[in-house]
Amino acid sequence: MIIKKWSIYRASLDPVIGSEQGKSRPVLVISENAINDVLNIVNVIPITSRKEGRKIYPNEVEIPAHNYGLSNESIVLCQQIRTLDKTRLSHLYGTIDLKVKQSEIIEALCFQLGIDFEA
């Protein structure tokens, strides 16, 4: 399976402990293509549906409904970075190809990790 950075897949995240995101849900691949091509693991960020009135934090990025193959308004949870075996990935929803949205995600990741970086 060829996995590309910025692609959104469905992934099985269970088993989990405590507040970790679980179940089968969309995830955003953030690891570099050169690494994805040679390793059996990928770095991902879980995505969750946005509930009405839910606040968006600086380490999160909103994705409007009906974008990138997702039917609901969603949130990329940069505080929940995970490493997964590629076999956990199934359905490809789409790809975040908009540079502005990629930059928002990089900025949220840097905020989460305490990295001073201008995307």
Where are these regions (language model features)?
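Short secondary-structure boundary segments
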Residues: 1-2, 20
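Low-complexity, compositionally biased segments
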Residues: 17, 36, 40-43, 88, ...
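Compact nucleic-acid interaction/catalytic patches
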Residues: 19-24, 29-65
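C-terminal terminal-subdomain/extension
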Residues: 1, 66-119
